[in-house]
């Protein structure tokens, strides 16, 4: 979606409802059921129902309304949000050592997202399909196969883009939230006593009465706020105000009414705990509700998949993941992308999770650790931005951080109890992604430093070539260079082996700035280094895709005429070998070699015609 000025506020707000709130909007399917299912040692008791409802409501108020919508969303990079954006903002005005710590926090947060994203589609779709147990109990054996079929279709359509079906997301999700509100209100009217749980003292009473068990039960309460990171991550698509407006006018009232409606039902009929959401509906509405619930969970899953694609692109462009094929599925919207490798790896992981856990209640045990871990990191990073970038009073910032952590840390600690019952899954996946990202970044830096150790001066080499030129051949040669003031390896090897040089030489560097977009005015910088040498530096934001043809067009506008099909592109292709290392660094080196072999080649990254590319190999020890 785009927040084009021509779009009206209601249209953008409706679109935000369709995308941003899919995950948190489907939480009523399973949250209260997991809270009161008996796993914590108490059943459907009045004090327990009131306590859980009070905790859920005030978590929605404090975590979503105050922390994320009011505070965290103030931290934006040209309107964009997300944990990696927060990481880069926090590290702008800090020491090198502090910046390194903040980068590690940001990468852990991003890794947690990868771990949690495998569970979200599985638990959402399964919890909707489990409505079959109410409609037709004899079909309960079909829950797993039907869940896999639905998700298979969802992952298959990713390559075609979601622009067409995406237009339906907003009205479907608006209908979903209105149904949530209607079902809840109907039940509350029948038993208005449940509204007493709006009083936060019921949450306090819950802790005093149930003591240690109540603390462990926070691991189930947190299910009500899963998906809260999407509010911040999708800020660039819709803007702050539409996301806030959607929350306070539609989403929060609907969620509150539905949770309290389920509570009212349970007070009246404790046996409804087997599936309080679907049992809110009259019998005639069960099948339509099952259908709309399935659609809502598919939309929630789609939002998560799109989020993975966006995070992966950002990590690739910032140098934390190896280059991979990224396909744009819309000519109008740069945010609509498809990454085949990520799509099918995620699909395989989701199917394995569904087959292994078999029921959404089992998956709920795996849910929450990564979410609450990311919440802790977001609190630290966002308050760092408030102190270092906004220059807020340090004591005021400290109070904000303490308030956030007083909620985040108990939630995270309570979820650690899930570690053996399924919480190991997102943590394991997150750990793998953290190792991959830190390995690629550190080993890539080591490789570039090794390649540039020759220490030859670019200016001195150009002066020498102009003074005593080798044989010059007609045409233009472009040498891709990762660093601005370093002699490209391909140039040195071409002179060493071929002993010729083109009449015109362009040293081209494509760099990614710490911003989502770069204005066209700043896209290309051209510097003539000598009569036959030019340096071209093209800058892109991490939401943009570098394109050499566009760079040539910009060069032509500034007086350096280049024609793609009359230009030879020289690139170096490194053959890497591992030097002597300790065993743990050797393992990391082998992982890097694997990533390097499977990385997208530079000509494919920058859309250079293959018949214009000349690759010169070189062996480098790292």
Curated annotation (Swiss-Prot):
Spans through the membrane: 9-29, 49-69, 103-123, 137-157, 165-185, 213-233, 247-267, 276-296, 337-357, 363-383, 396-416, 419-439
Highest taxon, organism lineage: Bacteria
A Pfam family matched in the record: K_trans
Cellular component, GO annotation: plasma membrane
Catalyzed reactions: K(+)(in) + H(+)(in) = K(+)(out) + H(+)(out)
Alphabetically ordered keywords of this record: Cell inner membrane, Cell membrane, Ion transport, Membrane, Potassium, Potassium transport, Symport, Transmembrane, Transmembrane helix, Transport
Topology with respect to the bilayer: Multi-pass membrane protein
S-S pairs: none
Molecular function in Gene Ontology: potassium ion transmembrane transporter activity; symporter activity
Compartments (UniProt record): Cell inner membrane
Family indicated by similarity: Belongs to the HAK/KUP transporter (TC 2.A.72) family.
Role of this protein: Responsible for the low-affinity transport of potassium into the cell. Likely operates as a K(+):H(+) symporter.
Protein name: Low affinity potassium transport system protein Kup
Species whose genome carries this gene: Escherichia coli O6:K15:H31 (strain 536 / UPEC)
Name of the gene encoding the protein in the UniProt record: kup
């Amino acid at each position: 979606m785009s927040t084009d000025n021509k779009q009206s506020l209601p249209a953008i707000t409706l679109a935000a409802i369709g995308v941003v709130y899919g995950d948190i909007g489907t939480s009523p399917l399973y949250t209260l059921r997991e809270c009161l299912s008996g796993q914590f040692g108490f059943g459907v008791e009045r004090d327990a129902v009131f306590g859980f409802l009070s905790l859920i409501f005030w978590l929605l108020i404090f975590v979503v309304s105050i922390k994320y919508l009011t505070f965290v969303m103030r931290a934006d990079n040209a309107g964009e949000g997300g944990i990696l954006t927060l990481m880069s903002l926090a590290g702008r005005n800090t020491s090198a050592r502090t910046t390194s710590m903040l980068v590690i926090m940001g990468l852990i947060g991003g890794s947690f997202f990868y771990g949690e994203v495998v569970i979200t589609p599985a638990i959402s779709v399964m919890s909707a399909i489990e409505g079959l147990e109410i409609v037709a109990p004899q079909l309960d054996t079909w829950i797993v196969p039907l869940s896999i079929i639905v998700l298979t279709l969802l992952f298959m359509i990713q390559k075609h883009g979601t622009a067409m079906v995406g237009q339906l997301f907003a009205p479907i999700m608006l209908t979903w939230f209105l149904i949530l509100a209607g079902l809840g209100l109907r039940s509350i009217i029948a038993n208005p006593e449940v509204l007493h749980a709006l009083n936060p003292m019921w949450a306090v009473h819950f802790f005093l009465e149930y003591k240690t068990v109540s603390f462990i039960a926070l691991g189930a309460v947190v299910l009500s706020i899963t998906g809260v990171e999407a509010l911040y991550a999708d800020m660039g698509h819709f803007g702050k105000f539409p996301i806030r407006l959607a929350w306070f006018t539609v989403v929060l009232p609907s969620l509150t009414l539905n949770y309290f409606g389920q509570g009212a039902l349970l007070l009246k009929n404790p046996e409804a705990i087997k599936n309080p959401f679907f049992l809110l509906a009259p019998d005639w509405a069960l099948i339509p509700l099952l259908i709309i619930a399935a659609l809502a969970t598919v939309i929630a899953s789609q939002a998560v998949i799109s989020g993975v694609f966006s995070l992966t692109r950002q990590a690739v462009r910032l140098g934390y993941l190896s280059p991979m094929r990224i396909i744009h599925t819309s000519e109008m919207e740069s945010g609509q992308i498809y990454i085949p490798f990520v799509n099918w790896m995620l699909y395989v992981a989701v199917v394995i999770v569904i087959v292994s856990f078999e029921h959404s209640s089992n998956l709920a045990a795996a849910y929450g650790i990564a979410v609450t871990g990311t919440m802790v990191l977001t609190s630290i990073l966002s308050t760092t931005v408030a102190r270092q970038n906004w220059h807020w009073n340090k004591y005021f910032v400290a109070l904000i951080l303490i308030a956030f952590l007083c909620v985040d840390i108990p939630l995270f600690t309570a979820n650690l109890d899930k570690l053996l019952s399924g919480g190991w899954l997102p943590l394991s996946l997150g750990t793998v992604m953290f190792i991959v990202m830190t390995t690629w970044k550190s080993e890539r830096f080591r490789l570039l430093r090794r390649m540039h150790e020759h220490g030859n001066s670019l200016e001195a080499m150009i002066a020498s070539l102009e003074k005593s030129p080798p044989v010059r051949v007609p045409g233009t040669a472009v040498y891709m260079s990762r660093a601005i003031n370093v002699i490209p390896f391909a140039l040195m090897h071409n002179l060493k082996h071929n002993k010729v040089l083109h009449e015109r030489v362009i040293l081209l560097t494509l760099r990614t700035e710490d911003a989502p977009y770069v204005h066209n005015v700043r896209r290309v910088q051209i510097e003539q280094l000598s009569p036959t040498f030019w340096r071209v530096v093209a800058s892109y934001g991490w939401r943009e895709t570098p394109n050499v043809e566009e760079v040539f067009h910009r060069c032509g506008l500034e007086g350096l005429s280049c024609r793609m099909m009359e230009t030879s592109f020289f690139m170096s292709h490194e053959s890497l070998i591992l030097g002597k290392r300790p065993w743990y660094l050797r393992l990391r080196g082998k992982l890097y070699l694997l990533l390097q072999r499977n990385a997208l080649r530079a000509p494919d990254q920058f859309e250079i015609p293959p018949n214009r590319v000349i690759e010169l190999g070189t062996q480098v020890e790292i």
